[in-house]
């Protein structure tokens, strides 16, 4: 949707998945031979194969070899792919003005510091659940349940895959609310971020 496309642009710039995928007009111009060439190129990239079933291993291997030329998978895979996060040196607000809409979808994004250790990874997971991960989180309870300032809330600190140690994570928060409640909801979110209340009983549940 529009809000998701804007968030991708803010976080990743030209690396936004909405900018990198082919447009409908470009797809219509593709020829059959172009698609086959792309498929052949994809088959040369190294991959992991998973099978769940009752067939003997030898039969599974034989079936795979019939359809995938494993001896030609010589191109190293860069999966999971890492996209560099954008850094902003001052608070910046991006708008998409849609006058006929009665609802606001607001995202907040902050690029974090590089993290390598396991303790920080576990801490980020705990924080995400505690702060905005589900219906018992701070965001949901304080913004939606107690004050009815939003329809939906979420807030998570996301770290890159283990394969990309030393790269930055990011904090992303989201509010979906009525236009006339937007500033009120943002005010509560700001207070939760700046002075996050500690609720010991909730921490035990998160663990």
Identify the function of each model-found stretch:
Residues 1-78, 152-207:
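Charge-rich, well-structured scaffold segments of protease-associated domains
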Residues 131-135, 139, 144-152, 191-201:
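Hydrophobic alpha-helix feature that most strongly marks membrane-spanning transmembrane helices
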Residues 1-6, 84-103, 144-154, 199-207:
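Short acidic/His-enriched helical or mixed secondary-structure segments at domain edges of catalytic enzymes
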Residues 76-142, 174:
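His/Glu-based metal-binding/catalytic segments typifying zinc-dependent metallopeptidases
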């Amino acid at each position: 949707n529009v809000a998701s496309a804007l968030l991708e642009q803010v976080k990743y710039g030209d690396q936004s998945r909405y900018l990198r995928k082919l447009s409908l007009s470009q797809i219509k111009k593709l020829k059959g031979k172009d698609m086959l060439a792309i498929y052949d190129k994809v088959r040369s990239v190294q991959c992991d194969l998973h099978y769940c079933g009752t067939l003997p291993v030898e039969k599974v291997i034989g079936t795979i070899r019939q359809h995938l030329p494993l001896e030609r998978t010589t191109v190293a895979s860069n999966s999971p792919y890492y996209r560099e996060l954008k850094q902003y040196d001052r608070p910046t607000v991006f708008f998409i003005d849609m006058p006929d809409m009665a609802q606001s979808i607001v995202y907040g994004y902050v690029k974090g510091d590089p993290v390598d250790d396991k303790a920080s990874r576990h801490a980020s997971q705990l924080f995400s659940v505690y702060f905005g991960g589900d219906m018992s989180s701070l965001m949901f309870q304080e913004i939606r349940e107690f004050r009815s300032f939003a329809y939906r809330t979420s807030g998570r600190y996301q770290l890159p895959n283990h394969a990309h140690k030393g790269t930055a994570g990011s904090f992303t928060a989201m509010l979906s609310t009525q236009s006339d409640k937007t500033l009120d909801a943002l005010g509560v979110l700001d207070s939760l971020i700046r002075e996050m209340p500690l609720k010991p009983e909730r921490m035990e549940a998160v663990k």
